[in-house]
Amino acid sequence: MPERTIADFKRLLADQPTASLLAAAQADPRKGVQQAYQHYLRQAEKQAVLVTRFNQHMRLERDFWAHGGQYVAGIDEVGRGPLAGPVVTAAVVLDDHFDLLEVNDSKQLTAKKRAALMPRILEEAVAVGIGVADAQQIDQLNIYEATRVAMAQAVRNLSVRPTRLLVDAMQVPVPIEQTRLIKGDAKSASISAASIVAKVVRDHLMTMYDQVYPGYDFADNMGYGTAKHLAGLASLGATPIHRQSFSPVRNAKRV
């Protein structure tokens, strides 16, 4: 058998290498082979970290399934703090076939990574529900209660009825048993997936609002009170999507 080329090693190491191939790569003195081997080791280490984290994040769901539960929904929200735009919630039901290792708290992911994961979550999840509370509801109810209403809406919009909810530090007003978790999006894959879905949906809405209401930099700040947003408020006044109960919106003129 002819000696493997450096290109051969690079190709084979990138595709589930056998133990014998790894041993051959480790023993090969050529610089190019050693570089390819070290790259494989770094990638394997990263993959192992992802697998470990994923298994930790699936622990609550797997425990629920092991005790006879069928559908557990993770719920999260995005947009409680901004001065403008809705609060968006998502409820996501997974099963034991779910294997997106990169799913994590949406705040730990780039916009590009969230956008890439979103369709895969929608494809692999058993069910996904969305809830939205607009600025008017937020002003009428307060942000906490509006978020709870939106979470209940997300649960109702699921195509299956969950028998357990995993919620990030809130109580959802639905007659379903709930487990409240502090920083749940870092502890549950279902909540992490919900945080990604809610974030992508809300960012898309705010990007659309940026076209409707130019001058506030919504596509960049997503409604949060950045310097450009506050400058827009001062010069243009508040829009219909601004939360009138939030300072400094309260004293701004209306568009």
Curated annotation (Swiss-Prot):
**One GO molecular function term?**
manganese ion binding
Q: How is the cofactor bound?
A: Manganese or magnesium. Binds 1 divalent metal ion per monomer in the absence of substrate. May bind a second metal ion after substrate binding.
Q: Which domain of life is it from?
A: Bacteria
* Compartments in which it is found: Cytoplasm
Q: Which CDD domains match?
A: RNase_HII_bacteria_HII_like (cd07182)
EC numbers on record? 3.1.26.4
Give the main localization category: cytoplasm
User: What GO biological process terms does the UniProt entry carry, in alphabetical order?
Assistant: DNA replication, removal of RNA primer; mismatch repair
Looking at the record, the residues that make up the RNase H type-2 domain are 70-255
This protein's GO CC annotations: cytoplasm; ribonuclease H2 complex
Reactions catalysed: Endonucleolytic cleavage to 5'-phosphomonoester
User: What are its cofactors?
Assistant: Mn(2+); Mg(2+)
* Any Pfam family matching the protein: RNase_HII
- The EC class name is hydrolase
- Residue positions binding a divalent metal cation: 76-77, 168
InterPro entries hit by this protein: RNase_HII, RNase_HII/HIII, RNase_HII/HIII_dom, RNaseH-like_sf, RNaseH_sf
| Keywords, alphabetical | Cytoplasm, Endonuclease, Hydrolase, Manganese, Metal-binding, Nuclease
Q: Its family?
A: Belongs to the RNase HII family.
Q: Which NCBIfam families match?
A: PRK00015.1-1, PRK00015.1-3
Q: What does this protein do?
A: Endonuclease that specifically degrades the RNA of RNA-DNA hybrids.
Q: What is this protein called?
A: Ribonuclease HII
The record lists the organism as Lactiplantibacillus plantarum (strain ATCC BAA-793 / NCIMB 8826 / WCFS1) (Lactobacillus plantarum)
